[in-house]
Regions:
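Short, Lys/Arg-enriched, disordered terminal segments
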Residues: 1-3, 38
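N-terminal beta1-alpha1 ligand-phosphate binding loop
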Residues: 4-27
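Glycine-rich phosphate- or other oxyanion-binding loops that anchor nucleotides, phosphorylated ligands
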Residues: 28-179
Length: 179
């Protein structure tokens, strides 16, 4: 039997991230699991925020498991509420330059999304802290995806919802449902 996991990094309560799953993925929540419209059942894994939580939580998950990482992300120029299907994960190192491994992700199957036409494609930069400024445009910033990808999952896709334009205040309002 294939393993299917939706990975979220909820800092507070699970409701905000669960809302994202219901708003953007085809299916429904039943018995604490996500039932995709195609009949697959997805276990929800809450990692917590940041690299160490990701590694501790996901270390024993089979590398051939199907993983959907869904969550909030900041962006310098995408509108709040934009849906981004991530094609590549990178670490955010604005002050250093060295060759990093390519962390390419699979394409998000359009059948999994409620509104696939709305999904922008982009790079996601993972940072160890909230990003408040950046010269990078047409991308998103989170605190987990590059670390999830670096663990070597073969079937990883990611959907990010822009919560802020590099503003901690905006992020907190959107995450709390004050849109």
């Amino acid at each position: 039997m294939d393993k299917h996991f939706i990975v979220i990094a909820e800092a507070g309560d699970f409701i905000g991230e669960q809302k994202l799953i219901a708003q953007h993925l085809n299916g429904e929540m039943r018995d604490g699991k996500w039932h995709m419209a195609d009949g697959t059942v997805w276990e929800i894994i809450v990692t917590g925020v940041g690299a160490i939580n990701v590694m501790k939580t996901l270390q024993d998950i089979p590398r051939n498991a199907q993983i959907i990482n869904i969550g909030y992300a900041g962006s310098a120029n995408y509108e709040i509420g934009s849906v981004v299907c991530v094609q590549e994960a990178k670490l955010n190192h604005p002050c250093v330059s060295y060759l990093e491994p390519e962390l390419l992700l699979k394409n998000v199957p359009s059948a999994w999304l409620k509104s696939p036409a709305e999904c922008l494609t982009s790079v996601c930069y993972s940072n160890t802290d909230f990003v408040l400024q950046s010269d990078y445009k047409d991308c998103v910033f989170d605190m987990e995806l590059a670390y999830i990808a670096a663990l070597g999952f073969e079937n990883l896709v990611a959907v990010k919802i822009v919560s802020d334009n590099l503003s901690l205040h905006d992020y907190r309002e959107v995450a709390a449902g004050v849109e």
